[in-house]
Regions:
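Juxtamembrane "helix exit" motif at the C-terminal ends of alpha-helical transmembrane segments
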Residues: 291-308, 371-382
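Alpha-helical membrane-interface segments at transmembrane helix boundaries
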Residues: 273-285, 289, 301, 305, ...
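Juxtamembrane/disordered regions of integral membrane proteins
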Residues: 338-352, 374-383, 415, 422, ...
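Membrane-water interface of transmembrane alpha-helices in multipass transporters/channels
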Residues: 303-317, 380-392
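Non-transmembrane, extramembrane segments of multi-pass ion/lipid transporters
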Residues: 245-279, 328-353, 410-414
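Hydrophobic packing positions in regular secondary-structure scaffolds
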Residues: 1-265
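Alpha-helical transmembrane segments in multi-pass membrane proteins
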Residues: 31, 286-294, 317, 321, ...
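Interfacial loop-to-transmembrane junctions
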Residues: 411-431
């Protein structure tokens, strides 16, 4: 929270029963900060704080609480208090909240929600998970294209108090088809007698309810939007997506990508709140896949067993070659995956990527293998031929690893597979196997084993 209030101060005021003073302090704070403090308190005390707050303020605090705390509150407040919270919460926040609750809590919530809002909630819940429809809100302002500016402003003043999106308004025709958008600034600065259809902007970006939320987030980023209309297959306006919800989507998608890049199945749960069994379940499958795929490395070593028996010292350099190759491939893969996510790189750029990674890998490989040659030759006394074999192996491994790391995510994207899957663990497994083959083959050629 802000420096003006501390957790210890709240505890002290509670223990001294100075509730009026505590209330005055809390209502001056941002609801998000109050929600953070609320999360720190045990059940007996947090409900005292919650009931102490004014109803409109407490409902806003409620929307920022974790699902666990929200459930705790709902289980311990009256039906009348639930009704007020539900009516005061924005619809999209209400839907997000309901999706996290068990059936008995959902029944209690819907029982204390107005018929109109309950109908809207049920409608929103029908949209597919991770679709544009699932993250939109219907609390927006729209005008008919036949309105004058004065009529629109009068209408705005009448309904804006209950709407989530008020900076951008939407214009529809008599069939509810979206025909334009108009900002509040444009509305206020326009002549009262002008028609909305003459002042609106017809160059807008919209998405369908079924469109993927990740693609929607990309459009927000590309066009620098704060609000985007959502339409049905007949271009009728059904909702809008606001930037605060898209930020949540971006966070969610980034988290999923990071988890996939670490060879885990994505999870929406917070780490400290997720059970041990759940964490193990999300990790074990990919670990099994990678463990089995790593047997190829063992097969290569077994094939060249005679080479190793003839020159045991070659085994000393295997970990260094494999680790360097894996790291080199991961660097390229990470940059390409990020470029794909930001729509900076497409499959059609694959030749450009290969050419760039080739040049980078030659430069990096030359420097690393040169340093490595000198290090091995002068400090390990392994001899010129051995030092040369290791250096050339490293040079070729880095080139191969960087090209593979750059190409695999693009191939995955073209096959409609998440590029994040083609990340560090998988690329490392492929590179390890190839690096060993290069190393042993060069050893046979140069060392005459």
């Amino acid at each position: 929270m802000k420096e003006g209030i501390k957790l210890e101060e709240i505890i002290q005021l509670l223990e001294q029963n100075r509730l009026a003073e505590l209330k005055e302090i809390l209502i001056k704070e941002n609801p998000i900060d109050v929600a953070e403090v609320f999360e720190e308190f045990p059940k007996e005390r947090d409900l005292i704080i919650f009931k102490l707050l004014p109803k409109d303020f407490s409902s806003e605090v409620f929307s920022y609480l974790s699902p666990e705390k929200q459930q705790e509150v709902i289980e311990n407040i009256t039906d009348e208090e639930i009704k007020f919270i539900m009516e005061d919460m924005y619809l999209d926040d209400t839907v997000d909240f309901i999706e996290e609750m068990p059936a008995n809590i959902v029944d209690k919530i819907l029982k204390n929600t107005s018929h109109d809002k309950r109908k809207l909630i049920n409608q929103m819940l029908k949209y597919p998970e991770n679709s544009a429809g699932s993250v939109m809100t219907v609390e927006y302002i729209s005008f008919k294209d036949s309105y004058t500016v004065k009529q629109a402003i009068d209408y705005y003043r009448k309904i804006a108090i209950d709407k989530e999106e008020t900076d951008i308004c939407f214009v529809t025709d008599n069939k509810k088809k979206l025909v334009g958008i108009i900002s509040l600034k444009t509305l206020i600065l326009s002549n009262d007698d002008s028609y909305i259809k003459d002042e609106m902007d017809t160059n807008f970006v919209s998405v369908l309810t079924k469109d993927d939320q990740e693609e929607t987030a990309a459009l927000f980023r590309k066009y620098d939007l704060t609000t985007m209309p959502v339409v049905d297959h007949e271009d009728r306006l059904v909702g809008v997506i606001t930037v605060d919800d898209i930020v949540d989507v971006i966070d969610q998608e980034n988290t999923e990508d990071i988890q996939k890049m670490a060879a885990m199945n994505p999870s929406d749960e917070e780490y400290l709140k997720e059970s041990v069994m759940s964490l193990a379940k999300h990790r074990i499958i990919w670990l099994l896949v990678l463990m089995i795929s790593a047997t190829f490395t063992g097969m290569v070593i077994k094939k060249y067993e005679e080479v190793l028996q003839s020159a045991v010292y070659l085994a000393v350099f295997i970990p260094m070659l494999m680790d360097t190759g894996g790291n080199a491939g991961s660097q390229s893969a990470t940059l390409i995956i990020r470029g794909i996510a930001l729509e900076e790189i497409e499959f059609s750029d694959i030749l450009k990527v290969i050419w760039k990674e080739l040049r980078v890998s030659v430069l990096v490989g030359f420097i690393l293998s040169g340093i490595n040659f000198l290090r091995i030759y002068y400090f390990t006394k392994s001899g010129f031929e051995t030092s040369l074999v290791v250096a050339i192996s490293m040079f070729l491994t880095i080139i191969m690893a960087k090209v593979i790391g750059g190409v695999l995510p693009l191939i995955a994207k073209s096959l409609k597979i998440d590029p994040a899957i083609m990340a560090s663990p998988l690329i490392t497994t492929i590179v390890d196997t190839a690096a060993l083959i290069i190393y042993f083959q060069l050893s046979v050629i140069f060392l005459h084993i």
